[in-house]
Amino acid sequence: MGVKKKKEMQVTALTICHQDLETLRFLADVEGKNLASLLLYCVQLTDGVSQIHYVKQIVPLLEKADKNGACDPIIRSCLDILAGIYLSLSVKNPLKKVLASSLNGLPEFFLTEAIQSFTSRLQEELNTTDLYSYRKVIDNISSCMENFDLGRAGVNNLLKNVLHFLQKSLIEISEENRKFAGNRIVQTQLMNDLLVGTRVSVMLVQKIQDIQRIHLKTSSSPTWQSMCGLLSIFTKFLSDDDLLQTIQSTSGLAVILFIKAMFHPPEKIPDLISSLLLRSVDCTSIPDWFLNCCRSLCCTDVSQSTLLFLCQGTLTMLDWQNGSMDLSGEALLLNIVHILFTLSSQIKESTLELFLSRILASWTNSAIHVLKSSSPSLKNSLNGKSSVVGRLLEYVYTHWEHPLDALRHQTKIIFRNILQMHQLTKEKSNSEVSGLAADHFICDLTEGLLRLEWHVKGKYTCLGCLVDYIGIGHILALAKTIPSQILEVMGDQSLVPYASDLLETMFRSHKNHLKSQALDSTWIDEWHETWVSPLLFILCEGNLDQKSYVIDYYLPKLLNCSPESLSYMVKILQTSADAKTGSYNSRGALGALMACLRTARAHGHLQSATDTWRNLVSSARIKQGLIHQHCQVRIDTLGLLCESNRSTEIVSTEEMQWIQFFITYNLNSQSPGVRQQICSLLKKLFCRIQESSQVLYKQEQSRSKHEPENELTKQHPSVSLQQYKNFMSSICSHLFEALFPGSSYPTRFSALTILGSIAEVFPVTEGQVQAVYQLSHDIDVGRFQTLMECFTSTFEEVKILAFDLLMKLPKTVVQFQDSEKLQGLFQAALELSSSTKPYDCVTASYLLNFLIWQDVLPSSLFDSLKTQQTACEDGDKSAIVVERNTLMVIKCLLENLEEEVSQAENSLLQAAASFPLYGRVHCVTGALQRLSLNNLQLVSEWRPVIEKLLLMSYRLSAVVSPVIQSSSPEGLIPMDTDSESASRLQTILNEIQPRDTNDYFTQAKILKEHDSFDLEDLNVSVQNIGASAEVKGKERKTCDVTAQMVLVCCWRSMKEVALLLGTLCQLLPMQSVPESSNGLLTEEQVKEIGDYFKQHLLQSRHRGAFELAYTGFVKLTEILNRCPNVSLQKLPEQWLWNVLEEIKCSDPSSKLCATRRSAGIPFYIQALLASEPKKGKMDLLKITMKELISLAGPTDDSQSTVPQVHALNILRALFRDTRLGENIIPYVADGAKAAILGFTSPVWAVRNSSTLLFSTLITRIFGVKRGKDELSKKNRMTGSEFFSRFPELYPFLLQQLEAVANTVDSDTGELNRHPSMFLLLLVLGRLYPSPMDGTYSALSMAPFIPFIMRCGRSPDYRSREMAARALVPFVMVDEIPTTIRTLLAKLPNCTDQRFRQNHIHGTLLQVFHLLQAFTDSKYRLNTYFQQELADVAVCTRAKLWLAERQNPCLVTRAVYIDILFLLTRCLDKPTKGNQPAVECLGFWEDVRRIISGSELITGFTYTFTVPGLPQYLQSLTKLAITTAAVAAQAGEQAGNIPISFSQLLESSFPEVRLLTLEALLERFSTAALGLGEKGLPPLQRNMGETFLMLAVKENHPECFCKILKILHCMDPSEWLSHMQRCIHLTPKEFLIWTMDIASNERSEVQSVALRLASRVIAHHLQMCEETRDSVAPTLKQWVQLVVSSCGEHLPTESRLAAAEALTSTTPFLLTSPHPVLGLQDTLALWRCVLTLLQSEEQAVRDAATGTVVTAMSQENTCRSTEFAFCQVDASIALTLALAVLCDLLQQWDQLALGLPVLLGWLLGEDDDFVVHLENTHQVEDYLFEKAEINFWAETLIFVKYLHEHLLRLLSTSSRRPLSPESLRHLRRTASEQGHLLSQLFRELPPAAEFLKTVEFTRLRIQEERTLACLQLLAFLEGKEREDTPVLRASDSPAEANQFTLAKTETAH
């Protein structure tokens, strides 16, 4: 919300040559009043901004001189100097424009002299011969022509010279560009010069052609010759593909412009250009000069780009307006568009595609201009039904989903222009309405667009254009629910911007329409109903994403359009806020209300905060919103408080109180998005405070004039300022308290981020600036130590935030007086940098950086460097201090590393166990990354350090490479479970030297051939390892080393070396020449680094190794491409050619690593190509792709297998690389061909690589999968769009598919000949026809359909299924019924003798998938839909034998039954005035006959070995369930039903029972939630007895689980009464049986049984006393069961069941005024609630929060808190639960018995502290065991809340609740624990918080618990805190004490 600071203007001061300076000195008068004096003073200034002031005084001074009527020599000389000054200024210098503007006002008297001066000076400029000065001259010519009269006059005077100069300069620059081919940096500058020169030539001719046409009349004139020369140059540029396309494009403009200027007569120009474009130039009829200049355009074939840019030039440079075009011009217009259509189908390059789209849009603009005064024939050619418009629309439909945003934008322009063109071709109509109704083009267009699916982005833009064109009325008449439809899709982020823009267009149009027709204000009701009501529905009921996007995109636009609608929305939401309170997954009306108010306030639709709180929303609602269970409600409420459209709006007292309340409970958010929003909103609030405080300070300063008042609080500014200070100080205190020991990662992240924002918003001020708050004032030693302690976090984000915050504090805050402490910190950092724990070195890096930047390194480090220190005292003190410190630390680390590498060279095992090497390297990299290495002052000292660093990196890499580059480092090193592993490691490390060769493919598996696997080689190698295991290592001491340690040491060392080398390349300046003094890296060192990366990328076999090298290599290549050193700049190109040659030659001796994915080779080439500048021609990419695609193609040469696999793998990597963007798209078609053909290879490696490449291409073409459905509409493309983007694939795919289809139906079904069918169907299945496809495309999808149908006859089951899925998108929705009938007709009759089940199955699958697509379409329920389905049903009945026993194949029977099932579902809908179509057709009789005759009734003779039996059972059961359900709903008698639910449940097949139970469970669940329309039918309602009997005898686990779930859903009163009669169990016995199941079964059944038992208990407890007493004895077992289900180690489902059990029994067991259970059991249940509230699982916490909400909403507890009946978050639910519990203890009068238990919770008696301490020592043995990582639960927060509530409880208690004996026991326990803690603190080493973080944190937490307990005990004894013998500071070591003292109050 802060106001952006205005960017300061940078103006370079003007200067003049020495001679001119002397002239001015000579001419200046003594008084300093003449022009020379003014100019002299001006040029002597060094500030350009000040000079502007004096430049503006020139003309006023000359105006005075003009009155004297003489132009004296002084002024003449000054004008000459001014001309020189103007031409010397750079084109971007603001002084140049200021000077031109001033001289434009020159008095007429001086114009002649001034023009002469400018002409003279410009002539001097034109005479220059220095090629690298040409650009400056060209810029000057350009400047003279732009709004500068003197300059334009000078150019006119020198036109001949100027043209000659431009011709000469362009020729010479072009030649220079050719010489520097390959030097990108120089070429970029030269091409830019060419571009500017071309543009200036165009501008020159445009601006002076009318004045200078006389020069062009004679062909011998120099001007004419120069023009011809320039035209020749531009023609050459136009055809030169080595130039930038912008140069070619501008040359196209220049060619047409020059032709227009030079060709006579002008009326023949359109014909001439037409003949040029159509390649039909008659060379005999054109002038010789034209033929000489444009011969390449007239007589040879031109490239696509040349033709394209000529079209662009024609449309831009010819005058299409004002009716200036005759019939030849109209013909040219039509010729251009047909050429563009042709080019559209040929161009593949993305940049040219973009050019074409812009040119096509430009063509539509020109067409509109011409149509305004065109001939009737042109209007006929361009009306809505014309072929041109049809093809334009096809272009729009094809490209409106294009990946390039700019191209999609052009389609919108084209579509909008098409509507305008159509409007201009229409005949005028008397009535707008009749005109619209009669306009078939617009009507068809509108209906076609509305028929499209909403996932099509182009639909939105085109509908928006239509609304602008015809208004909203017609569209609302066709689709009244369109607002709801659009809002429905706003859950998809990719569609949201399009949808919101369309909605805005629509509701604004609708509002204007209604207002224009209305007589009063009632129109707003209709507008609200149409646009606001759907919005409110989404806000209350929509899904999370949908609501968020609607609020962010739609709501602001709606309020901006109609601010008065806010009160309407608030009124509706206020009334429903109590009913719709929301939950953890629903915002409810309260959330919607907060979102609306937040948006309104942020956009300035609320007058002030005070009005908002008073009139629109209550304080209680605000607080509810701030702790609501739904995170977005909390965020929106916070946003309402923080955001304002006025950055200086004063923050009210209420707002500050609410913010404090919010921060208390919302720092610990697990969602990164929520944390980011909280921090962002609070930063906005702080900016408001900062900016409004400045306003208050100003008011305070002016109070002497009048008494100012705060507009909100009506109080003095000083009071508000003091409130601000108190508020900020309070916030910071709370944030520092949140960094307590054991605080979670989210809490620390949030607190540190907010503190960082405070430090940023309230910076340290200097001078007179008044600051309302400064964070540094609130930082003491304790808080400083707290921030330091954050470095020990296992999350690097926390370390970064803490470090950044410390860096923002002034150095005076950070005071280190104790040199021992400094030495200890430095030693701790060094120790951590060599720790065996991988995360310790990160802590070390931050510690060292902190010591470096704060200049607090121990003095002992500098003892050997006194001379350097004295030499560094000059210059920038702070920068050089940091540089010196960094250098010293790196030297220290290097010395240690050198020693350790030497030891590692002798024994890698010892290094891995004692000093893994990577930590030191990590710290070096960390130190270098924070230092600005481009302007070092100690260069001479850095050079040997860098050299040593490089050598050390290579040595270290050599030590670990044997492990990294071995064939299998993980496999060859034995696992830690082997007791002899440590002794065998060294021997094995010697065994795993790399022995990889390039013979990977020599034994490639060929299809239909089998290779035997010989175990002897493996046995020999195992024996060798075993024999060597006795060899002892040479280390002096025994190392406790594991295989994991060795691997981590080696892999991380390699990673750190790669990152270090990459960092050095990226940050260190390179020496441009060997003797250069400014660079640190020499050319030779850079090449060495490149060779290092090359070796690891090309020869490492493991992904981890080459990925690490890739990271550094990318940094190196990026630097090399920008390097001015030409030899270094060309290195990537040389490396690329070398590796491509090595891949092509396939030499067996090659060192390239050949694996199934080519190891690091693709990464290597990827890095080389991705670093190529994207703005160039991308020549390396083009050549490489050409080579790779030729290698990837099929080959008969077995020697080519390795290159083919490499090529396929490299192509895959390149297509995956997003950095290549659209530049890779032209090669997609060839890549797809290679992948599909490669899949047919007999070599497995080729097939494997082809599959991977194909998968990548599918993602590249159709996008990353964005839906659950494999063929999601979001990942599909219309056939026309696909084939227009990749036209080469049309004939290829069709040909391949035809080849497959022609052989797949043979008698033998030779599938193996065409394994590519799978890939073909996969591609085709992602295409679909669009209703907008026109008839103009030659790329029709129809030819594919018969071949896909034939593929359905494949003998392979998966292929038949894929063919069926692939067919669906090829058939238009309204053609599906016809296609289904055709397919059904092909099925055999029961009388046919010969038929193949594969054919039947394939056809039936196609019918099924087509029918499924049709029934899912939007045609549901209309008459057309029902009629078409009825016709399909008739055809289906004709082949009914396929579903009966006459068909022996169960697979085809199953599919046919699935078809019947679909039909019964869709036909069972009554049409208007008729009974359901199913009944009319007699369909149910057929279905019942099939079921009656099926094996479900007669029994099965099959076993599970019969193919298709499970599938058949499932299909038949689904149909039977539908039949039974329909009959039950209709109330039919049991005798009329072929099979009942009870019979299905008695089936011997579990599949049948499971499906039936699932169907019944769905119905019972719906009925239990009250979502059913009429409840359960009678036949289903009375099944309780059936389920009881099933529950007892069911053995199948899943079925048993479903039965228990159904019983849980049913009302227990419906079945408990039948229990004794049905299963002979009493309620008590049934409860025990259920709990036994919950105790013994697996987790899912256990959870369901616990829920069921809890529901039964709740039912009994609310019944009569006798029933209650019967279950009372079993409650203790139930309590134990619940307690055992709450452990954090248990599955989530168990804990969710426990939470649900607690919620259902809360009113009876947890909060009952008369407890049923004993106090111990009741408190045990409450402890369960508190445990679940601290779970790491969000779902568990939410469920437990439901228990708390229930608990505090009972009659006897609703006054315990202020949030009764509110949906609250788990963070506040914890304290609310404790509040309710303490209140209940008083109600029950059980304080004396309950208090010891609660004090035990406080002390942590349930956590065995001693066991924890013993386990701590074992932690050291595990390499990656970081500590008890907590993402949410915080022990001390629980302690804090419990302490607060117990203190409040004891304060309000009227009598002492505990006896002296109880007090003594508790005190003794706490005191013993305190003394143990003291002893343990003393045993810790110095800097324990860093070196022993886990133990230190655990001790600190226990210390806080002990202190809290002792304080309460002291309070109980009536003593003051000071008299309590608690743990004292002196009991802790000094190192721990500094932290402990600062944190004593944290938990209180």
From Swiss-Prot:
<dbReference type="Pfam" id="PF25151">
    <property type="entry name" value="TPR_Trm732_C"/>
</dbReference>
<keyword id="KW-0819">tRNA processing</keyword>
<feature type="coiled-coil region">
    <location>
        <begin position="883"/>
        <end position="915"/>
    </location>
</feature>
<feature type="modified residue" description="Phosphoserine">
    <location>
        <position position="1012"/>
    </location>
</feature>
<feature type="modified residue" description="Phosphoserine">
    <location>
        <position position="1158"/>
    </location>
</feature>
<dbReference type="InterPro" id="IPR056843">
    <property type="entry name" value="THADA-like_TPR"/>
</dbReference>
<protein>
    <recommendedName>
        <fullName>tRNA (32-2'-O)-methyltransferase regulator THADA</fullName>
    </recommendedName>
</protein>
<comment type="function">
    <text>Together with methyltransferase FTSJ1, methylates the 2'-O-ribose of nucleotides at position 32 of the anticodon loop of substrate tRNAs.</text>
</comment>
<dbReference type="InterPro" id="IPR019442">
    <property type="entry name" value="THADA/TRM732_DUF2428"/>
</dbReference>
<dbReference type="GO" id="GO:0030488">
    <property type="term" value="P:tRNA methylation"/>
</dbReference>
<dbReference type="Pfam" id="PF25150">
    <property type="entry name" value="TPR_Trm732"/>
</dbReference>
<feature type="modified residue" description="Phosphoserine">
    <location>
        <position position="1021"/>
    </location>
</feature>
<dbReference type="GO" id="GO:0002128">
    <property type="term" value="P:tRNA nucleoside ribose methylation"/>
</dbReference>
<keyword id="KW-0175">Coiled coil</keyword>
<keyword id="KW-0597">Phosphoprotein</keyword>
<dbReference type="InterPro" id="IPR051954">
    <property type="entry name" value="tRNA_methyltransferase_THADA"/>
</dbReference>
<comment type="similarity">
    <text>Belongs to the THADA family.</text>
</comment>
<dbReference type="Pfam" id="PF10350">
    <property type="entry name" value="DUF2428"/>
</dbReference>
<dbReference type="InterPro" id="IPR016024">
    <property type="entry name" value="ARM-type_fold"/>
</dbReference>
<feature type="region of interest" description="Disordered">
    <location>
        <begin position="1924"/>
        <end position="1948"/>
    </location>
</feature>
<dbReference type="InterPro" id="IPR056842">
    <property type="entry name" value="THADA-like_TPR_C"/>
</dbReference>
<feature type="compositionally biased region" description="Polar residues">
    <location>
        <begin position="1935"/>
        <end position="1948"/>
    </location>
</feature>
